Amino acid sequence: MSGKISEEAMQEQAERAEYVKNIGIEYRFGCYEEKRPESCQLLGEYMEALQQNFQAAVAIFKKNCDENSYPKSCFKYGMYMLAGKVGDDASLSKMIRPMKIACDANIPQGCRYLSLVHWNGEKDRKADSEKAERYMRRACELEDGEACWLLSTWYMGNKEKFKTNAAGEAKELDRAELGSLSRDMDKSLQFAIRACEMDIPQSCANVSRMFKLGDGVPKDLDQAKKYADRAKEIMETLRSNDTNAGFTG
């Protein structure tokens, strides 16, 4: 019986390997022979996820962005640049073109990262607060909760640093200049509430703090409790999801 199971398992494994191989052939043909940008994107994702060949994936995304201006590939390429996996040049400026293409195609995170590039100045490029605000607003309009939250903190007058890398890890970048917006607590509250409605717990906590302290808005302890409770509820849900992530029943 065990021999039969082993034989069946081996056959299934062989069939899966053949399927994966055929998918790769199909994507290569679509990309290189038929010159279809969407096939190149799929090929890049195939090399990234199934072959774990990140160098090849980056090259495919870059070419598809440079030659075809394909938004998804441009976003992928931009994120690889942010993660420091594209050569030795750490210049954020090179992210502007690919992220602009992604943003123009309504990829929310593309707008958010494009905004953050403009928010963070470099030695040879000053921060552009106007563009940073514009693109962060666009990301928020596209229902990117993180963008709404960041925008709300900017309107508090804080100089937030670019802290998120491609892996979602905190990383403080040493930049000579950061953008700044005039303090506007009405706008800060507006975008903080919007981010809270998109389940960003730290934004709910910010709203609670504003109402509790009367920071730029009328003091309202009932509203403070409401948003504090909402922050706790979201955090409990996130913890529960993390706990159950590996449960298959």
From Swiss-Prot:
- Spell out the GO cellular component terms annotated for this protein, sorted alphabetically and separated by semicolons: mitochondrial intermembrane space
Q: Where are the Sel1-like repeats?
A: 37-69, 71-107, 108-144, 201-236
- Any Pfam family: Sel1
Q: Look up keyword Repeat and say if it applies.
A: yes
Keywords, A to Z, come to: Repeat
| Record-linked PANTHER family | CYTOCHROME C OXIDASE ASSEMBLY FACTOR 7
The record's similarity note reads: Belongs to the hcp beta-lactamase family.
The protein here is known as: Cytochrome c oxidase assembly factor 7 homolog
In its UniProt entry, the species of origin is given as Caenorhabditis elegans
Query: Source gene?
Result: coa-7
